[in-house]
Amino acid sequence: MSVENVLSLIQENEVKFVDLRFTDTKGKEQHISIPAHQIDADFFEDGKMFDGSSVAGWKGINESDMVMMPDPSSAVLDPFTEDATLNIRCDILEPATMQGYDRDPRSIAKRAEEYMRSTGIADTVLVGPEPEFFLFDDVKFATNMSGSFFKIDDVEAAWNTGTEYEDGNKGHRPGVKGGYFPVAPVDSSQDIRSAMCLIMEEMGLVVEAHHHEVATAGQNEIATRFNTLTTKADEIQIYKYVVHNVAHAFGKTATFMPKPLVGDNGSGMHVHQSLAKDGVNLFAGDKYGGLSETALYYIGGIIKHARALNAITNPSTNSYKRLVPHYEAPVMLAYSARNRSASIRIPVVPSPKARRIEVRFPDPAANPYLAFAAMLMAGLDGIKNKIHPGEAMDKDLYDLPAEEAAEIPKVAESLQQALQYLDADREFLTAGGVFSDDFIDSYIALKTKDVERVNVAVHPLEFELYYSV
């Protein structure tokens, strides 16, 4: 969409506000709303100044001025606001140079795509993430000196089979690990997901399917069509915005937290990816699983750098409560055709044009711009250095003998460990100036604060284990 198209859209839809949006390091959308009558063609040249020191992990107060530069191609009407509002995504620029800020996730994603093209390896990267989420009726939590707790409830939860309700307990609900594909009334989220899908399509996403996921208490997934890297990251931010707001409208609360429930599956964000050049899928070939040698090298790069990637693709302390065996979480750094216990799967596809890999360890807490860019950089490093991933593992990796399992590398065991790997293994990210050392240092510092806060927190389970010693 051009600037002229945006200005026409504002006029034709009697738009009252333009909502400028950007994504911070943690992956959360931020915004500022401007009366639409202030928007003209010059606005798309000059941008909007703002205080970058107020964004966690960004600039200090002594150099806080930054520019939000609206991208007219991202303009979309907001279906949730009372007054007609047009959302426009922004890149964050340095005012002195008007170049992308090195800590701006969207600018990093764009640089990753530019770097890929500069290598001559490929001109297009296609990304197809599958974020899962939970819908709850009620969530309470508190952390202070007097105590800590969280309490989740949902009418669909397996623990509510004996709960008394005013209009009676209807009994239909998925059990633990029993939520995959049952029809209503066991699946109580059908209409909510349908409403989400309709709004996602209204906002430009292509929805392929929606369904209940494995876990009890309202785990769900909506599958959307793949897209190029930065555009798909934009779409994931729209996806999350829609899920949160439709859930709210239905009297529910949505979370993309990787592991809100103990004892059932967590939420992942498997990421399908492939490279193309001149319209030809570079991952299709005659090697294992119908892959090309290029695809195998790409896998090799992902596996080699996986533990550093974990700091970005699994960026919360909670992420590592999901990455444990037997909850469909891929902890083994291996690849396989169809085998879902491997961290990288080669899906069955109807034609070579659709050949791709699926990286299964990421989760939806990840900043999509950073996660997709980091995986691309790891894959490109594998191709450039011809890193072969070794033999495929066509067996259930969860049931291997201990000696055999010990020989297979695994994902990082904690966020703290992943950050250490990122600190030591960063050159693949800084190639071509895509990620800067300054960004990586600031990212590690920001996430280390989370680790330190969790490490010193007194956990309720510690009272169960140790109160009576």
UniProtKB/Swiss-Prot annotation:
Reaction equations catalysed: L-glutamate + NH4(+) + ATP = L-glutamine + ADP + phosphate + H(+)
Note on how the cofactor is bound: Binds 2 Mg(2+) ions per subunit.
Residues the entry annotates as binding Mg(2+) 1: E130, H270, E358
Listed SMART domains: Gln-synt_C
Residue list for modification O-AMP-tyrosine: Y398
Positions of Mg(2+) 2 binding: E132, E213, E221
Activity regulation comment: The activity of this enzyme could be controlled by adenylation under conditions of abundant glutamine.
Domain of life: Bacteria
Gene Ontology MF, one: glutamine synthetase activity
Sequence ranges assigned to domain GS catalytic in this UniProt record: 105-469
Binding site for L-glutamate: N265, G266, R322, E328, R340, R360
Pfam families: Gln-synt_C (PF00120), Gln-synt_N (PF03951)
Positions with a binding annotation for ATP: E208, H272, Q273, S274, R340, R345, K353
Subunit-structure text: Oligomer of 12 subunits arranged in the form of two hexameric ring.
Function: Catalyzes the ATP-dependent biosynthesis of glutamine from glutamate and ammonia.
Protein name, entry field: Glutamine synthetase
Organism: Vibrio cholerae serotype O1 (strain ATCC 39315 / El Tor Inaba N16961)
